Amino acid sequence: MTVTTKQEWYLEYDITINRPGLLGDVSSLLGMMGINIVTINGIEEGRRGLLIKTDNLEKVKRFESIVHEIDDITITKLREPELRDRLAVRHGRYIEQDATDKKTFRFEREDLGLLVDFMAELFKENEHKLIGIRGMPRVGKTESIVAASVCAHKRWLFISSTLIKQTVRSSLIKGEYDADHVYIIDGAVTARESNQKHQDLVKEVMKLPSIKVVEHPDLFVETSEYEMRDFDYIIELRENKDQEIQY
């Protein structure tokens, strides 16, 4: 028996004429063409996003050509889904991404659920990543990292931290060296720590083929051999969009 592999696509469209039954008509058209809807959600005002699945790219192209003749909707995106697309359908909004620095993403405290989901998806990819997270004290940085680790079924280890009490590790035991762990470094604590054993441990951890999350990355790079360009992702977390992150 031959099993046909189906591929997912992300479809997003603007609603130009918001009439009753529009969503049903779009769904019916997809079904008639043999395209399955995996997930659907409103993406901000007047826009919908769908994850669709089909075994034939030609079906997607035919759907697109038919929709071009319809005045009610305008397709804005039709592509293989990116992580931001999947999260947008899941949460009903896009993550804010810096216009010039594409590896920088911005969140507000009310977006903690979206932030945790975003980081958890990054953690699940099971490959080396260096992630920096900026934010003022008590905005939810550490809690978000821990929550994302739990969601991704990863064990987390504090190399340096101020959560509950100040933690400064100078060594790890055998079971704590694991590519499946998430290592958390408070860049502010590490930057002012004079214990050479701690600094040596940080260098060792940074070379591990695992996920490292550095809080206050700007302070971390000031006293280390690393630069901001070494980070794969930079996350900024604020109480509100107007809050300035200052050190």
Please provide the spans of the model-predicted regions.
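A conserved regulatory-domain signal marking ACT and ACT-like small-molecule sensing domains
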Residues: 1-113, 121
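Conserved nucleotide-sensing/catalytic segment adjacent to the nucleotide-binding pocket
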Residues: 156-218
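Hydrophobic beta-strand segments of well-ordered beta-sheets in folded domains
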Residues: 38, 49-51, 129-131, 179-186, ...
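Short, well-ordered alpha-helical microsegments
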Residues: 23, 60, 141-142, 220-223
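Short, aromatic/basic amphipathic alpha-helical patches
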Residues: 62-67, 148, 223-228
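Hydrophobic, well-structured mid-protein blocks that either form specific transmembrane helices
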Residues: 113-126, 132
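Glycine-rich phosphate-binding P-loop
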Residues: 127-160
